[in-house]
Design a protein with these regions (language model features):
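Positively charged n-region of N-terminal signal peptides that target proteins for export
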Residues: 1-4, 19
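C-terminal motif of bacterial Sec signal peptides marking the signal peptidase cleavage site
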Residues: 13-16
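Structured interaction patches on ligand/partner-binding surfaces of diverse proteins
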Residues: 19-20, 71-73, 101-144, 235-266
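A short, Gly/Thr-enriched small/hydrophobic beta-strand-prone motif that recurs across taxa
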Residues: 21-43, 150-163
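A short beta-turn/strand-edge loop motif at beta-sheet boundaries
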Residues: 43-51, 164-171
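Tryptophan-paired
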Residues: 51-110, 169-250
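A sequence/structural signal for flexible, mid-protein segments enriched
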Residues: 123-209
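Short, low-complexity, Pro/Ser/Thr/Gly-rich segments in the mature regions of secreted, periplasmic
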Residues: 200-203, 213, 275-294
Length: 294
């Protein structure tokens, strides 16, 4: 009888040794975390990688033992990032972008702010980028994603040469470009919204007038035109409006290559010159350099 009891006890002891606690790989066995890498090769020559950028992950998050459908956001200053919080298993969208002064973002749409004169503000420094990808979150694991960041702005360079007349008579030049876009979809790169205008700040050095501006694109359905006002030393002003839609044909297709527009300007010697002294010529429309007459 004692032998039977001892035998049964041994069997129970051995059986209990086979019951083990589950072994997990992470402290979050029912959820996953999201880590990522940003890749910045798609940028124009001389364009720097932003010092910091925002990352949003849309999905079911788990923070402080509460689950909810929300967007987790973090600020990163390196090419790698780790999102805060935990995520339910399943697909989540990861969206990264950098914010510039005068540019806001809401719901994946970036919008350039408007100044007091009704024209778009031009960011003082930096270029807008964004990248998006979908990653599958697995419980008890880390989901890793690589975001190919895309340049979302393009530079326009205006260079005018005063070829005849009296350059010193030009005391001021004001110009604006109409038909540009104010908003862009950070996921797709599509420009949206109504047509807007941006000021062109020309500076004169000797016989050269130059202006550079960064824009997120043009509204293809709108007319692109340049409105220019020249002021001379006798306070006489000449304003012209010229259609330059052909010059900006396919402008949105290549954000990495600046659009360079060159031209010539005649500064009349006499007072109150007659005729139109600004005469923009249509460009070649292929996104390359454009030669105009002014």
């Amino acid at each position: 009888m004692k032998k039977i009891v001892l035998f049964l006890g041994s069997v129970l002891l051995l059986a209990s040794c086979d019951v083990k606690d589950p072994i997990y790989n992470t402290p979050h066995p029912n959820h996953g975390i999201v880590m990522g890498l940003t890749e910045w090769s798609q940028r124009g020559e001389g364009v720097e990688v932003p010092a910091e950028y925002l990352v949003e992950v849309s999905g079911t998050t788990n923070t402080a033992n509460a689950t909810a459908t929300a967007t987790a956001t973090t600020t990163a200053n390196a090419t790698t990032f780790t999102m805060p919080g935990l995520f339910e298993p399943g697909n989540v969208e990861v969206l990264a972008y950098n914010l510039l002064a005068g540019v806001s973002a809401n719901g994946g749409i970036a919008t350039v702010s408007t100044g007091t004169d009704g024209t778009l503000l031009v960011p003082d420094a930096g270029v807008l980028f964004s990248g998006v990808a979908t990653v599958h979150v697995v419980a008890d694991d880390t989901a890793r994603v690589t975001l190919a960041m895309q340049q979302r702005m393009r530079e326009v360079r205006f260079t005018l040469t005063i070829t005849d007349g009296a350059p010193e008579r030009i005391t001021d030049i004001k110009a604006r470009l109409d038909g540009v876009a104010a908003s862009i979809n950070l996921r797709t790169g599509e420009v949206i919204g109504n047509s807007a205008s941006v000021m062109l700040s020309f500076l004169r050095k000797g016989d050269k007038l130059s202006a550079n501006v960064w824009i997120i694109g043009i509204i293809e359905e709108a007319k692109q035109q340049i409105v220019t006002t020249l002021t001379f030393s006798d306070n006489h002003r000449i304003e012209t409006t010229t259609d330059v839609t052909d010059i900006f044909h396919n402008f949105n297709a290549d954000k990495l290559t600046p659009l360079s527009i060159t031209g010539s300007l005649y500064a009349p010697v006499g007072t109150k010159p007659d005729g139109t002294i600004i005469d923009w010529k249509p460009g070649n429309g292929d996104g390359g350099d454009v030669d105009t007459n002014m």
